[in-house]
Design a protein with these regions (language model features):
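Lipid deacylating catalytic domains
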Residues: 1-69, 76-217
Length: 217
């Protein structure tokens, strides 16, 4: 278990402040990132803000590698971060990532209808929404870096093939973006009420799976 948790607040001008302090000998510290302006339209800005958090962690705590856990739109911000800064060796390097309810190829009733888009066995979507096309460079960025990926999504089992907000096809389309580049890629599907979009990250089984994946030797 980890006791060391701090929160990084990013103001709308991109300034980062930490609430709390990490001990120098902290094992597996957790940094929760809260963006003051967390909206879909600002992916490149959000990615830059995410980088600001990492550089501050680097200078204050000597972080040289990190694991990422994201929910919903946060996954897209992180994909944009990796697309823009993933090859920058001066930054802390990604070790493992957990994507929960990822919106890689859209959000229901925003840019796709229920059961409109499917993915094939490689995770390739039958229609690609923005910014999915641009994100296809991730395959090259993830190559040879030894990154491990756990992709968690929920199916309400109500015929929508979704968690109520995000289609399973949108979440599973991450597989096609990364191809064989990660060291490992695994999907984990949760079903029924506890798999609802907002419930997923409150779900104890999800929490346990995440802890195992990130920290079990």
């Amino acid at each position: 278990g980890t006791k060391d948790i701090i929160t990084a607040y990013v103001s709308k001008d991109g300034a980062v402040t930490f609430k709390g302090k990490l001990r120098k000998d902290a094992v597996n510290p957790i940094v929760k990132i809260e963006l003051e302006n967390n909206r879909q339209g600002y992916l490149d800005k959000n990615a830059a803000w995410f980088k600001n958090v990492l550089t501050k962690l680097q200078s204050e705590y000597n972080f040289d590698k990190f694991n990422f856990v994201g929910h919903s739109m946060g996954n897209l911000t992180f994909a944009q971060y990796m697309m823009t800064y993933g090859n920058d060796k001066s930054l802390p390097q990604l070790n493992k990532q957990v994507n929960i309810a990822g919106t890689f190829n859209g959000v229901l009733n925003m840019n796709e209808d229920v059961n409109e888009i499917t993915v094939d066995k490689d995770g390739k979507p039958s229609r690609m929404n923005q910014p999915y096309q641009q994100l296809r460079v991730l395959k090259d960025i993830y190559k040879g870096k030894g990154i491990e990926v756990l992709n968690i999504y929920g199916d309400l089992k109500d015929g929508t093939h979704s968690d109520g907000r995000v289609s399973n096809s949108s979440s599973k389309s991450l597989k096609y973006l990364l191809g064989n580049s990660p060291k490992s890629y695994r999907e984990s599907k949760y079903e029924g009420e506890p798999a609802q979009h907002s419930q997923l990250h409150e779900n104890e089984n999800v929490a346990n799976e995440l802890i195992d994946f990130l920290w079990k030797k």
